[in-house]
Amino acid sequence: MFSTSRIISRINYNFLRKSHYSTKTVAEQAKGRFTPLIQKLSAVQQPIMYWANVSKELVQQVYHSQKIAPPSNTHSPFLFWKSQSSEAWGRNFFIAVEIVGIFCAGQMVGRRKITPYH
């Protein structure tokens, strides 16, 4: 009676013995299949890099000429949320619940049933 590990090792040995592909032949086949693709991609690479550099220079010129700068802390979007009072938060919460309810009712009317699409 054979143990499972002995059977598996025997199967692996037979598989490796019967395989007629060596690493070298597999590498040669892969090289033969991918060489045309690599040549096409290398032909496209130069125009892509050229236009990427042109775009970068154009963006830099616009950035400097328009005096664009990253937003400062005085215009931070978090200041809007910090300035909200608890009354405003409650009002906005109930407005959001109302909007979600109207959306769900519209979905039910559109599907002509209360349950989801299933």
UniProtKB/Swiss-Prot annotation:
Q: One GO BP annotation here?
A: proton motive force-driven mitochondrial ATP synthesis
Q: Where in the cell is it found?
A: Mitochondrion membrane
Q: Which GO terms describe its molecular function?
A: proton transmembrane transporter activity; structural molecule activity
* GO cellular component terms listed in the entry, alphabetical order: matrix side of mitochondrial inner membrane; mitochondrion; proton-transporting ATP synthase complex
Asked whether the UniProt record includes GTP-binding among its keywords, one would answer no
Q: Kindly give the InterPro entries that the UniProt entry links to this protein.
A: ATP_synth_F0_gsu_mt
Tell me where it mainly resides.
mitochondrion
Alphabetically list the UniProt keywords. Answer: ATP synthesis, CF(0), Hydrogen ion transport, Ion transport, Membrane, Mitochondrion, Phosphoprotein, Transport
Tell me which family the UniProt entry assigns to this protein.
Belongs to the ATPase g subunit family.
The record describes the protein's role as:
Mitochondrial membrane ATP synthase (F(1)F(0) ATP synthase or Complex V) produces ATP from ADP in the presence of a proton gradient across the membrane which is generated by electron transport complexes of the respiratory chain. F-type ATPases consist of two structural domains, F(1) - containing the extramembraneous catalytic core, and F(0) - containing the membrane proton channel, linked together by a central stalk and a peripheral stalk. During catalysis, ATP synthesis in the catalytic domain of F(1) is coupled via a rotary mechanism of the central stalk subunits to proton translocation.
What's the subunit arrangement here? F-type ATPases have 2 components, CF(1) - the catalytic core - and CF(0) - the membrane proton channel.
- Under which name does UniProt file this protein? ATP synthase subunit g, mitochondrial
Protein species of origin? Schizosaccharomyces pombe (strain 972 / ATCC 24843)
